[in-house]
Design a protein with these regions (language model features):
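Acidic, aliphatic-rich amphipathic alpha-helical segments
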Residues: 291-331
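Low-complexity, intrinsically disordered or signal/transmembrane-proximal segments
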Residues: 4, 20-26, 42
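N-terminal beta1-alpha1-beta2 submodule of the flavodoxin-like/Rossmannoid cofactor-binding fold
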Residues: 48-163, 213, 238-290
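Beta-strand-loop-alpha "switch" segments that mediate conformational coupling across diverse proteins
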Residues: 217-224
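Conserved small/polar residues in nucleotide/adenosyl-binding loops
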Residues: 335-337
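Short, glycine-/small-residue-rich phosphate/pyrophosphate-handling segment
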Residues: 161-214
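Short, positively charged and aromatic/hydrophobic N-terminal segments
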Residues: 11, 40-42, 46-47, 265-268
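Intrinsic-disorder-associated, low-complexity terminal segments enriched in Asp/Asn/His/Tyr and depleted
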Residues: 13, 27-33
Length: 337
C-alpha cells in the first residue's frame, strides 16, 4: 500500500513494510489550571479592589473544552496584574437551562422574572454581578453551540418590551435593558476547526453586535483549535497560549487588547497545508472511500504532515518507522522531482 505526499520540490511516499521497532506514543495531557476565586458578595464600594469576571463556558465538553484553555490563559494574565480579581465560572454543560418558551410573561405578567425556575437565574445574577463577561465557546456550524444560544435566548427578562435602539446596535430595532449595563464589558474567546478564523465568524459577530452592541466587545478567535488537545504539539500551542496570557495582562491594565497583541493572536498555529494534512489524517478514514484505515497509517500520516519541506537538501532518503508493539512498519520516502 503506497500513499504519496507532495512537498514542493520533494515527494514524500508512505509505504508499509513488514518490520517492527519503536513504541507507539502515549498521550500526555498537560492541563492548564487557573486559580478561580471563591464567589463572595461584594458591595459597590469594593468594586475598585479588583475586577469581577464571569466566565461563561458554552462548550458542551465542559472543562475538557479546547477553547477553555485559551480562556484560562487569558485569566492567568489578568491575575498577574489584578491579583484581587474575582472570577466565577459557569459551565453551561452542567446547568439545567430550559429553552425559552416565547411566552413573554417576563415582560408583562411577571416583569423581569421568568416563569421557569432553573439555573438561568444564576446566569442572570452573574451577569448583573460581573464587570466583565467572558463568552468562551467553540464555533459550531459557523455559529455558537446550542447551549450558548439557549443561554442568550433566556436573557429576555433582562430587557424591557419597548422598542428602543441601544448604543452600538445595528439600526434594525432593539429593546432597552431593564438594568444599567453601561459599565459592563464583554470578551468573546473561541476556537474553530478550520485553518483560520478569518471569514468563519461572520454570524457570531453579527449576533453579538445585537447582544452587546457593535464595537462594544473584544474578541479572540483562533483557528486550528483541535491542536490544543494534542500533547505532541504542546510546544507550539503553548507559544500561542502565552500570547493569550499577554492579552490578559494588557486587558487588566487598559481594559483593551493592543493591536500588536491582536496581530499575534491572528497568526496561524501552522501553515494551511500542514494543518489540513494533519486534520484530514486525524479522522482515521480513507479520503476517497471514507472507510476506516489502519490506525498506524493514520499516526504516520500525521507525523508526515509536520515535515518541513524547506529542509529538503535534494538528497533522496528513506525513513523507516517500526512499531514493534504492533508488529508493523511504514517507510517515508523523500524523492526529488
Amino acid at each position: 500500500m503506497t500513499m504519496q505526499r507532495i512537498f514542493g520540490c520533494a515527494i514524500l511516499n508512505i509505504r508499509e513494510t513488514a518490520l517492527q521497532a519503536t513504541q507507539s506514543s502515549q498521550d500526555r495531557r498537560d492541563e492548564l489550571d487557573v486559580c478561580l476565586a471563591v464567589p463572595s458578595a461584594q458591595s459597590a464600594c469594593e468594586m475598585e479592589i479588583g475586577m469581577k469576571i464571569l466566565l461563561i463556558n458554552g462548550s458542551p465538553k465542559g472543562d475538557r473544552s479546547n477553547t477553555l484553555k485559551l480562556s484560562k490563559a487569558f485569566l492567568e494574565g489578568i491575575l498577574e496584574i489584578d491579583k484581587d480579581a474575582e472570577i466565577r465560572q459557569m459551565n453551561l454543560s452542567e446547568k439545567k437551562i430550559a429553552p425559552c418558551r416565547g411566552c413573554f410573561a417576563c415582560w408583562n405578567k411577571t416583569p423581569g422574572k421568568c416563569v421557569m425556575t432553573d439555573d438561568m437565574q444564576e446566569g442572570i445574577e452573574g451577569e448583573l454581578w460581573a464587570d466583565l463577561m467572558i463568552w468562551s465557546f467553540p464555533l459550531y456550524y459557523f455559529s455558537v453551540p446550542g447551549l450558548l444560544k439557549n443561554f442568550i435566548d433566556r436573557q429576555l427578562p433582562m430587557n424591557l418590551p419597548f422598542m428602543e435602539e441601544q448604543e452600538g446596535q445595528t439600526g434594525s430595532g432593539g429593546h432597552p435593558s431593564r438594568y444599567d449595563m453601561s459599565g459592563k464589558r464583554h470578551l468573546l474567546i473561541s476556537t474553530c476547526g478550520f485553518y483560520t478564523a478569518k471569514n468563519n465568524y461572520d454570524s457570531v459577530t453579527k449576533l453579538f453586535d445585537h447582544v452587546c452592541g457593535a464595537g462594544q466587545y473584544e474578541s479572540i478567535f483562533c483557528g486550528q483549535g483541535e491542536l490544543f488537545r494534542v500533547p505532541e504539539l504542546k510546544a507550539r500551542t503553548d507559544e500561542y497560549l502565552e500570547c493569550v496570557r499577554q492579552a490578559g495582562r494588557e486587558y487588566a491594565q487598559k481594559q483593551a487588547i493592543s493591536e500588536d497583541a491582536k496581530e499575534k493572536l491572528r497568526e496561524l498555529l501552522y501553515p494551511r497545508d500542514v494543518f489540513e494534512k494533519m486534520a484530514d489524517a486525524s479522522w482515521g478514514v480513507e479520503k476517497k472511500s471514507g472507510e476506516k484505515e489502519d490506525p498506524v497509517l493514520t499516526f504516520t500520516r500525521q507525523m508526515a504532515a509536520l515535515y518541513n519541506k524547506d529542509s529538503f537538501d535534494q538528497k533522496e532518503r528513506v525513513l523507516e518507522i517500526r512499531y514493534t508493539d504492533l508488529g508493523k512498519a511504514w517507510q517515508l520516502s523523500l524523492i526529488h522531482i
